[in-house]
């Protein structure tokens, strides 16, 4: 399992690593690394290999929102059933069970503010068990998935001294 953890930690830092590169880094055979990865994929320990894209640097317009959702848990299923219904919408990027003032945090994306508002009003709010929602639009992303998205701008002004 120690090798599996080292594979996971390496892939978490750089999902582009090849089996060959991982094998060299870990001092293992390519076959054993490939088998470990395959097994972890089958067990849903490795669930995918997403790429982090800074959409603000492209021509594509994308609006991101965090929606606080208060729900009534269902008998015998708690929050799981409603969370499953919510995460199946294409607009939904992530759903988290939260502690505190609301139950679920739903991260969504859309082409416009209006498309996100339409999602909330026509799909999310009318669902059985949903008591209320509060939508917060992301204005700027500074860091995501542990990686900074903004570049430091060096101040090129000359210092003024008395």
Mark where each language-model region is:
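A compositional/biophysical signature of low hydrophobicity enriched in polar/charged and small residues
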Residues: 1-162
């Amino acid at each position: 399992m120690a090798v599996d953890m080292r594979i996971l930690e390496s892939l978490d830092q750089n999902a582009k690593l090849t089996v060959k590169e991982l094998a060299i880094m870990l001092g293992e055979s390519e076959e054993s690394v490939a088998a470990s990865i395959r097994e972890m994929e089958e067990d849903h320990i490795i669930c995918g290999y997403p790429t982090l894209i800074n959409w603000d640097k492209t021509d594509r317009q994308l609006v991101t929102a965090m929606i606080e959702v208060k729900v009534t848990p269902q008998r015998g299923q708690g929050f799981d059933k409603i969370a499953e219904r919510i995460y199946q919408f294409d607009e939904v990027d992530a759903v988290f069970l939260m502690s505190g003032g609301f139950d679920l945090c739903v991260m969504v994306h859309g082409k416009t503010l209006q498309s996100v508002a339409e999602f909330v009003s026509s799909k999310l709010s009318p669902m059985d068990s949903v008591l209320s929602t509060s939508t917060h639009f992301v204005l700027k992303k500074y860091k995501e998935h542990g990686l900074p998205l903004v570049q430091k701008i060096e101040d090129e002004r000359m210092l003024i001294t008395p």
